[in-house]
Regions:
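Loop/turn elements at helix/coil->beta-strand transitions in domains of secreted/extracellular proteins
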Residues: 85-90, 141-147, 172-174, 190-192, ...
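Surface-exposed substrate-engagement region within the catalytic domains
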Residues: 171-304
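Long, acidic (Asp/Glu-rich), low-complexity accessory segments flanking structured domains
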Residues: 32-85, 98-140, 197, 201-205, ...
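Sec-dependent signal peptide cleavage junction
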Residues: 21-33
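Active-site groove signature of glycoside hydrolases
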Residues: 96, 141-157
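Bacterial N-terminal signal peptides that target proteins for export
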Residues: 2-13
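Bacterial N-terminal signal peptides
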Residues: 12-24
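A motif-centric signal for short, conserved binding hotspots located
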Residues: 93
Length: 334
């Protein structure tokens, strides 16, 4: 009887030891096949710098419905759908407009209005409309973050006024924003929108500038360069590297995109933006036709798992390309 009890005690002790060891073993890295497009950031470690990841983004994100669509449409899905597809960087073009005596921010692409529907009588899409979709997505998917890169689209607008109206809109939901000018870790911004701005600070002395500074020199020159990128400063310690050769023809643009994918400079201290969009020289046609060629190439590209490609910004952005990009953050399926 004593021997039996001792054996039982030893077995129980052994089981406890095994369970204790198993509890201390870290979970294996997430496999690409198990990743959901709505929650793909969930298994990325909290300490990962947002700049040292592969993040799908969209160019002129609010142009699903837009005036003169043949020229100005760059997306065929809503912002809400883009987020569901897995895109986490939104390119926002802001213009001041007076409504009921008050200035508000609306979305445009150049001179073309972004709209809430395809109706010719549709009202203009507002920043508030977009933020509503972003907030709703983050509420349902708190593991995620969304970078909103704001550009003052109308050169006649006073940038100080754009800043003031933008900051006032953000102040209504301050807990849902990351507003520092330093690259955060993913853990710092889960469930939040990250503000990035492409305009210089024009507010009076005493007013604090908000958000990451994403300003870069125009890259509309058609000169073909071996290195198509340009660097700028986020702050004294961190930099921005951008490829936005928006006037290259298809073949030259694809070469520029590949150069940046092959030689990505994404790092803890460097945000790397690789725009795949182009308006070209007119040889192929409108943005949708350019995107058709470029997106086929992106889908066929040999993406490497474990490599940080930075933010890859896409026109007419399909779910399958978002998947190709964000799956590089994870281990391949076995």
């Amino acid at each position: 009887m004593k021997v039996t009890k001792r054996r039982l005690w030893l077995c129980a002790l052994l089981i406890c030891m095994v369970l204790s060891i198993l509890a201390g073993i870290a979970a294996p890295p997430a496999m690409a096949a198990n990743i959901s497009s709505t929650d793909w950031m969930e298994t990325v470690p909290d300490e990962t710098k947002l700049s040292n990841m592969s993040i799908p983004g969209t160019h002129d994100s609010c142009t699903q419905y837009v005036d003169m669509r043949y020229i100005f449409q760059c997306q065929d899905a809503s912002v809400a759908t883009q987020l569901i597809y897995g895109y986490r960087y939104l390119d926002m073009r802001l213009v001041l407009e007076k409504r009921s005596g008050q200035e508000t921010l609306v979305l445009k692409h150049n001179i073309a209005r972004c709209k809430v529907s395809d109706s010719p009588f549709s009202r203009t899409l507002t920043l508030a409309d977009v933020l509503k979709d972003v907030y709703a997505f983050l509420d349902e998917h708190p593991s995620e973050t969304v970078i909103l890169c704001m550009k003052a689209e109308n050169s006649k607008d006073d940038v100080a006024d754009v800043q003031s109206v933008l900051y006032e809109a953000i102040s209504r939901e301050p807990d849902l924003w990351y507003l520092k000018n330093e690259i955060p870790t993913l853990g710092e911004v889960r469930g939040k929108a990250v503000l990035a701005t492409r305009f210089d600070d024009k507010l009076p002395v005493g007013f604090e500038r908000c958000g990451l500074y994403f300003g870069w020199a125009d890259q509309g020159d058609r000169t073909i360069l071996a290195d198509p990128t340009a660097d700028s400063v986020i702050n004294g310690r961190e930099t921005l590297c951008v490829q936005d050769r928006y006037n290259y023809d298809v073949d030259d643009k694809i070469t520029a995109i590949h150069t940046c994918l092959d030689n990505s400079r994404a790092a803890d201290d460097t945000f790397f933006l690789n725009f795949t969009s182009t308006s070209g020289s007119g040889k192929v046609g409108h943005p949708k036709e350019y995107a058709k060629h470029i997106n086929l190439d992106l889908y066929a590209y040999a993406w490497e798992t474990g490599k940080a490609y930075g933010i890859v910004i896409v026109d007419f952005a399909p779910k399958k390309i978002a998947e190709k990009i964000y799956q590089t953050n994870f281990q391949p399926t076995q």
